[in-house]
């Protein structure tokens, strides 16, 4: 028979009834029946054809409306499990047509597979796209699980290797520390702390210096009369300077007086004045008393000569020890100086009358008389 491939495959999938028209007692398909009928038409009798209820079998499997409608190509369905396993190649069709034993085996397997639709199809049949998609998804899930496990394992391996590396580094560092001697701890001082120390030391030194200055100023205040009432340092210093200048003027005045009183006596007045000025507790009257004692030891001829000598009122005496020239009339007009001299000589005369033994020092005098 000349049939299309689709029709032939469809007939191969359609099962026969419970009775085999060939009398073998095995179930088969319509395709097998038609193939045998075409090859050996004499084997099939009209009685067997009548007993073969084709319409009933078709009506059980497929609904009939307006004639027989064969199911479409099995590849168009979602899966091959609805119809069981089937041969897909022409070689399987030819072998099934030639070998009746293989046909009976195939019919038995198709029947069992049709009853057990959930079983996996066996043979050379193609897998359905749904099963392939399921297997692919399962493989992907398993791959993801495996990948995640592999990632976890790799992370664990990396962590373990890092720990091992850290332990190795620590062991190396410990060995190096053991090899090197421990350094002494260094005392680090902040810059601000150093500046604070410097300022503290500077302030202490400044305080000590100011204390010394204040002590010396108090000593000067005690020496200068009337200086204790002054509070300001500048004013106090001015007062001390004025007092020292006044003392200097007094010393100059006394030296000039001595030069005018005894102009012809050349004794070591400078040495006596220096020794008298060095002694701090000696007063002016004591110095004059020493000078008077030296005059008493002079011979009586000096006094007689002095009385007979004329008074040089208008003459100027040469300066002694570099003092300024002064005139005698102006000098003797000073009442204060005359009173001081009279008081000194009066004290000397009283002491001479009371004390016969004089304790005055007798300096060596070199008297020179002018003709």
UniProtKB/Swiss-Prot annotation:
Region Disordered, residue ranges: 1-25, 65-206, 352-371
UniProt biased composition (Polar residues): 85-96
Known outcome of mutating residue 29 to S: In strain: cv. Cvi-0
Database matches in SMART domains: HLH
Molecular function GO labels: DNA-binding transcription factor activity; protein dimerization activity; transcription cis-regulatory region binding
Tissue: Expressed constitutively in roots, leaves, stems, and flowers.
Biological process, per Gene Ontology: regulation of DNA-templated transcription
Basic and acidic residues: bias regions: 165-190
Keyword Nucleus: yes
KW Transcription regulation (keyword) present: yes
UniProt entry keywords in alphabetical sequence: DNA-binding, Nucleus, Transcription, Transcription regulation
Subunit structure: Homodimer. Interacts with IBH1.
PANTHER family reported in the protein's UniProt record: STEROL REGULATORY ELEMENT-BINDING PROTEIN (PTHR12565), TRANSCRIPTION FACTOR BHLH77 (PTHR12565:SF453)
Name this polypeptide is given: Transcription factor bHLH77
Organism taxonomic ancestry: Eukaryota, Viridiplantae, Streptophyta, Embryophyta, Tracheophyta
